[in-house]
Swiss-Prot record:
GO terms for molecular function: serine-type endopeptidase inhibitor activity. GO terms for cellular component: extracellular region. The modification Sulfotyrosine is found at residue 63. Gene3D superfamilies: Thrombin Inhibitor (Hirudin), subunit I. This is Hirudin-2B. Hirudin is a potent thrombin-specific protease inhibitor. It forms a stable non-covalent complex with alpha-thrombin, thereby abolishing its ability to cleave fibrinogen. Residues 55-65 have a biased composition (Acidic residues). It holds the Pfam family Hirudin. Belongs to the protease inhibitor I14 (hirudin) family. Residues 1-3 are annotated as: Interaction with thrombin active site. InterPro entries: Hirudin (IPR024793), Hirudin/antistatin (IPR011061), Prot_inh_hirudin (IPR000429). Keywords: Disulfide bond, Glycoprotein, Protease inhibitor, Secreted, Serine protease inhibitor, Sulfation.
Length: 65
């Protein structure tokens, strides 16, 4: 499974979509209401790219540099 990185902002909130990155070694955990996402160290919540459980889209290599 590939995890989607995110951008840290404000009170450690982040966007878990697009090409945003949370920072080296950090991943995004989705908030229960879909708003209060957090950047944390290590593996976070995988971001589904479709309505099928377990169906994830890999992060393009250029975003992992």
């Amino acid at each position: 499974i590939t995890y989607t990185d995110c951008t840290e902002s404000g009170q450690n909130l982040c966007l878990c979509e697009g090409s945003n990155v949370c920072g080296k070694g950090n991943k995004c955990i989705l908030g229960s209401n879909g708003e209060e996402n957090q950047c944390v160290t290590g593996e976070g919540t995988p971001k589904p790219q479709s309505h099928n459980d377990g169906d994830f889209e890999e992060i393009p290599e250029e975003y992992l540099q």
